[in-house]
Amino acid sequence: MRKKLTELLVCPKCHEALDCQPELIADDGDIRTGSLRCAGCQVSYPIERGIPRFVPTGNYATSFGYQWNRFRQEQIDSLNGTRQSEERLRNETAWDSSWWNGKTVLDAGCGAGRFLEVSSRNRECDVVGVDLSSAIDAAQETVSGRSNVHLVQASIFELPFRPRSFDGVYCIGVIQHTPDPKAAGQSLADVVEDEGRIAVTIYERRWSTMLYSKYWVRPVTRRIKAEWLLNLIKTIMPVAFILSEVLFRIPVLKRIFQFILPVANYVDSKELSMRQRYQWAVLDTFDMLAPAYDNPQRYADVVEIMKERNIGEIQRLSNPGLNLVGTKISSSEVAL
């Protein structure tokens, strides 16, 4: 943990200042171990392996911790030879490359650092990655050595940051996996600076969404131990992958088969090799079936949440899912 991060942090419970008490400091000034003690409620939060930890181990995101420590490399552009994460981040934020200069940005639900690895390439931008699960340790390995990246293990519902700390916040594919998507969205909006930007991508709920086959089996699969579920998927995948290779390519009918087969196979991807598609099929099928929560949201509901938290200039981008971007209305304008 670097000193600059301490300037943003507050107690997630009472929002009072934190006193940093380092125990081991690396040669580059990185605080490897120590604690952060709240001046108000006197709670002490540990700093372990260079990461401040504001939540206990073991929570509703445990499957994601297992997932991203097991599949850390698969979706990292610099490791898989593609630009998929770079293009997705650019498309789903719609933030011009020059906008990032001099900004402080939050990656909410950073996982193994798929998008952190991209956003932190601009060394003039400080990026904070936060995740509830042990995936934060996988992210640390992904962005190792980048002094403009700061990592925090915390809950999206109790973000340990000062209000309006960030010039930009992006949260891609995370909110639907929380027990309370509305509260998660509100929490994110609260840490956006006046005239700052926010971008979210969420599973969209339509009349047919809950008929999708993964929702038929999730009541069972989400209760299976992560290791057992992954082994089950690996056992089934050789047959499921071949079957989906055929069915997902049939004109007109392929959408029906994608709807009724709970298998992730990106048959239309030009960048991924067959081997990579197979790895992603295992990863994303697990991602569909393992999470404790999967709560798609309606467009109108998400827009209402954003407006309640003074997000204006809301636009829906033409990307898969419910992808919304907006700008925080300044306090002076709200007062008027």
Task: Indicate residue ranges for each PLM-predicted region.
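Conserved N-terminal segment of class I S-adenosyl-L-methionine
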Residues: R2-P160, Y293-P296, D301, E313-L336
